[in-house]
Regions:
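A residue-level marker of the well-folded mature domains of exported/periplasmic proteins
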Residues: 3, 24-199
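Gram-negative bacterial Sec-dependent N-terminal signal peptides
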Residues: 2-23
Length: 199
C-alpha cells in the first residue's frame, strides 16, 4: 500500500473529528441551567474582569447567573457558597479564595454540584483555571534585572505573598531569579499595605 493510501484514512478521520468538534462547540448550551459565580471581591481590576468574563460567558451560552461577591473578605466569600448550595445551582465557578472555601466546595460536591475554580487549587474542584505563576514570577525577575542592567535597589510591594498562593509563587520565583544578580538589592523592610480581611 502506498504512503498516500495509508495517510488518507487518517486524514479523513482527523477531518471528521474536527468537524464534530466544531459542531459540538456551535451547539454548546447552558439553556435552563443556573450557574453560581462566586468571587472573593470585585475591588481589584483582575478579579472584577474574571467575574465579568465568567458571568458574560454563562449568559452568552444561555445560562442564568447567580453572582455573589465576598467584598474582599475570605470568610464572606466562603459563606457565599452556602447561598449557592441553598439555591440548588447546577454548577459553581469560584474565583480565588483561601482555605475557608474548602469545606464549602466539599458540601457542593457532596450535593452533586460541580465546582470549577479560578486561581484556587482544590481537591473538590473539577477544574482549576490559573495563570502560569511560576513563569510569570521568573519572567518578571529576568525582565527587571535586564532593565536595571543587573544592578540597583528595588522597593518591593509585598502584601500578599504569604496569604495568597498565586502571589507567593510569583514572589518566590521573582526572588529566586534575583539570586543570579548579586548587585540588585531589595530595600528593607518590604512595603506592605495592611487592611482588614486582606487579601
Amino acid at each position: 500500500m502506498s504512503q498516500k493510501r495509508k495517510l488518507l484514512p487518517a486524514a479523513l478521520g482527523l477531518l471528521s473529528l474536527a468537524s464534530l468538534s466544531v459542531t459540538a462547540a456551535d451547539t454548546l448550551s447552558l439553556q435552563g441551567k443556573t450557574i453560581g459565580v462566586a468571587v472573593v471581591g470585585t475591588q481589584h481590576f483582575w478579579d472584577r474582569e474574571a467575574f465579568k468574563g465568567a458571568t458574560e460567558e454563562v449568559e452568552k451560552l444561555g445560562g442564568k447567573v447567580i453572582g455573589v461577591d465576598g467584598g474582599r473578605d475570605n470568610q464572606v466569600h466562603a459563606n457565599n457558597h452556602d447561598i449557592l448550595l441553598s439555591r440548588k445551582v447546577d454548577a459553581v465557578i469560584s474565583i480565588l479564595g483561601d482555605s475557608a472555601v474548602e469545606p464549602k466546595f466539599k458540601a457542593l460536591r457532596d450535593a452533586g454540584i460541580p465546582v470549577f475554580t479560578v486561581d484556587h487549587v482544590s481537591q473538590y474542584s473539577v477544574n482549576n483555571t490559573t495563570s502560569d505563576n511560576y513563569t510569570l514570577g521568573s519572567t518578571i525577575g529576568r525582565y527587571m534585572a535586564d532593565e536595571l542592567g543587573g544592578k540597583g535597589n528595588v522597593a518591593v510591594f509585598n502584601a500578599f505573598s504569604s496569604a495568597l498562593r498565586i502571589c507567593g509563587i510569583r514572589y518566590d520565583q521573582w526572588k529566586y531569579v534575583l539570586k543570579d544578580y548579586p548587585d540588585i538589592h531589595i530595600i528593607q523592610p518590604e512595603l506592605a499595605e495592611q487592611f482588614a480581611n486582606s487579601p
